[in-house]
């Protein structure tokens, strides 16, 4: 242990000495590297891949593949063209909707779609108003078409089918909504970044009362940001896949938080060294020697904790893990070298007008209030009372998370005037909302044909299920044609298509599906189909799979993150009980944060749900980021505890650490 401590101490002293002594080279070198990196950084691309939201072994994905294999065509698509005229679509416009869809099937349409599935709300059409005002056409494309290519092709299709009086509205569906969401993120992220940086600058300025401290923090962000984006660009280039657009806000939030924390750690220690009477360069060196181990340990813990996301079954989290880990690693490396060098270069201006401690004591005689409170709180009786009170508050706040509702409703989450949402609203004026993403129920009997009477009875039962506006199935299949969308030739597989009466990606639709799944054994048994297997396909089933996967992954990811934190904190502290207690507090604080989030967004603001991956990504960030503060506080207490009783060490170190 002593040899390892000596080696790490030598490395710390060497790095601190180099950063301070070579400050005139280090600062411009990092600035030049940031400029070059910014010229070659483009990891987030509009129209790039959407999130990999569904586990590869999802039953819904298998059912979707089975449906396509058995019936040769899906019941719907993720790209839908919408036409609507409140006065009614003309007969000519309706005829063009059908004719254009037929042209797609025959390969005579230049959109590139493999299949077009048109629906018009004519009188008697299921799950519709029946007033001939609305037409929706599901366009099915091959896998070689990128999301943006599909949307562009759908827009061209709409322009052709809607002229001159076809009342075009727009293109909607899951894929257009996600692309629109990504575009909005990329268009607004710059403003959000600017406002966030300005807020950080103001906070640092107010806390340190020193313009130089804000300059150091902003300069560090300015250097770390382009270098991080370049590193992520290289990862995307090597892997052959640009990062999902939804990742950028998480990367930005993490980078700004980590860089700000580390810069503040150095600045706070540098100010303390100056107040103790050290000269500027000596203070910079001493501050670097004190903070470098803390930043390095915190960065390693945070990076490895984020890599624990690789344990997820969701592609989104697996993609997120290396991106966030690299973000932390770059922030750590920049902070370890650039920040001490910049502080040494600026000298006292970095925290000007900081006064020596003697002047502070003279201006405010007596023991400072912070250490007195910390010394009082460190006494065991009062510490126990404070701990119990804090735990009670955290538990109460955390209990609010029980009402958390997870959703995947990407369309309804868009601004009201966005193209996909406008088109979806127009479609919902003529059809039930589920017409944009119908649910497929596939019933199969591997040994013999399914009884027609039983299928007819089951179809009637499905139409009466709560949460669904209509259903079609084998009873609607036209006999004597080669098209068999509901019943296979051998009669061993049947497909029922159900239309939800609510947003098909909402928590309500997922609950309706869960209720249907629970009722299906009884429904099938009463129809004489008890021996048949049942599968569920469609966007609602996929949304259910995604939410279930995240919920199922939550414990696995949490255990992985906590284990990494525990092991590394134990190595850093050379203890086991203290890391366990700190992790327990972290878990309670994360639960409380999640509970307050649920209360504010669902109860106060009235949102029906929270996007399903946000709470878990946020929880991982909170647990990991809090480890930085644990390392900082514990490191300072441990250092003070080498020469004084623990209570006095806490009284001395806690106020100084809290200022950072």
Segments (PLM) and residue ranges:
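Membrane-proximal amphipathic alpha-helices
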Residues: 52-56
């Amino acid at each position: 242990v002593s040899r390892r401590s000596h080696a790490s101490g030598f490395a710390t002293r060497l790095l601190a000495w180099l950063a301070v002594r070579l400050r005139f080279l280090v600062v411009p070198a990092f600035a030049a590297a940031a400029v070059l990196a910014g010229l070659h950084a483009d990891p987030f691309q509009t129209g790039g891949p959407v999130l990999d939201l569904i586990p590869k072994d999802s039953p819904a994905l298998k059912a979707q593949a089975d449906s396509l294999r058995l019936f040769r065509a899906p019941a719907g698509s993720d790209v839908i063209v919408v036409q609507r005229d409140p006065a009614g679509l003309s007969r000519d416009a309706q005829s063009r909707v059908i004719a254009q869809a037929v042209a797609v099937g025959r390969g005579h349409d230049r959109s590139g779609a493999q299949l077009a599935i048109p629906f018009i709300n004519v009188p008697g059409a299921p799950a519709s108003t029946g007033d001939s005002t609305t037409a929706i056409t599901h366009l099915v494309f091959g896998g070689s078409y990128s999301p943006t290519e599909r949307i562009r092709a759908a827009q061209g299709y709409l322009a052709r089918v809607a002229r001159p009086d076809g009342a075009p509205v727009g293109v909607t569906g899951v894929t257009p909504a996600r692309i629109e969401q990504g575009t909005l993120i990329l268009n607004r992220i710059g403003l959000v970044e600017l406002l966030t940086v300005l807020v950080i600058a103001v906070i640092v300025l107010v806390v340190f009362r020193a313009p130089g401290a804000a300059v150091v923090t902003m300069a560090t962000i300015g250097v770390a940001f382009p270098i991080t984006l370049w590193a992520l660009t290289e990862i995307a280039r090597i892997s052959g896949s640009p990062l999902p657009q939804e990742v950028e806000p998480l990367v930005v939030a993490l980078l700004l938080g980590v860089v700000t924390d580390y810069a503040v750690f150095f600045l706070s220690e540098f100010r303390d060294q100056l107040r103790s009477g050290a000269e500027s360069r000596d203070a910079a060196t001493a501050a670097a020697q004190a903070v470098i181990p803390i930043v390095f340990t915190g960065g390693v813990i945070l990076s490895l904790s984020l890599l624990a996301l690789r344990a997820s079954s969701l592609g989104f989290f697996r993609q997120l893990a290396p991106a966030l880990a690299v973000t932390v690693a770059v922030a750590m490396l920049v902070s370890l070298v650039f920040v001490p060098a910049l502080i040494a270069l600026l000298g006292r201006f970095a925290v000007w007008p900081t006064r020596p401690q003697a002047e502070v004591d003279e201006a405010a005689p007596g023991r400072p209030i912070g250490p007195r409170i910390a010394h009082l709180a460190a006494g065991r009786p009062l510490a126990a009372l404070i701990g119990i009170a804090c735990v009670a508050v955290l538990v109460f706040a955390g209990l609010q998370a029980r009402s958390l509702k997870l959703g995947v409703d990407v369309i309804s989450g868009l601004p009201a005037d966005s193209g996909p949402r406008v088109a979806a609203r127009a479609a919902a004026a003529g059809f039930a909302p589920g017409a944009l993403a119908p649910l497929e129920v596939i019933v199969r009997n591997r040994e013999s044909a399914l009884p027609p009477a039983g299928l007819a009875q089951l179809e009637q039962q499905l139409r009466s299920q709560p949460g669904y506006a209509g259903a079609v199935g084998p009873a609607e299949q036209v006999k004597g044609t080669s098209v068999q969308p509901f019943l296979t030739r051998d009669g061993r597989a049947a497909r029922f298509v159900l239309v939800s009466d609510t947003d098909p990606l909402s928590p309500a639709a997922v609950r309706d599906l869960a209720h249907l799944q629970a009722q299906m054994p009884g429904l099938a048994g009463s129809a004489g189909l008890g021996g048949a297997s049942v599968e569920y396909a469609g966007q609602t089933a996929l949304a259910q799979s995604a939410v279930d996967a995240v919920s199922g992954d939550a414990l696995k990811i949490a255990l992985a993150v906590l284990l990494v934190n525990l092991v590394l904190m134990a190595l850093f502290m050379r203890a086991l009980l203290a890391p366990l207690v700190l992790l327990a507090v972290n878990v309670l604080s994360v639960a409380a944060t999640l509970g307050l989030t649920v209360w504010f967004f669902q109860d106060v603001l009235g949102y029906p749900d929270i996007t399903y991956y946000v709470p878990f990504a946020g929880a991982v960030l909170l647990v990991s980021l809090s480890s930085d503060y644990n390392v900082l506080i514990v490191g300072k207490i441990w250092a003070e505890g080498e020469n004084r009783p623990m209570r006095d060490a806490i009284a001395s170190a806690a106020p100084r650490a809290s200022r950072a």
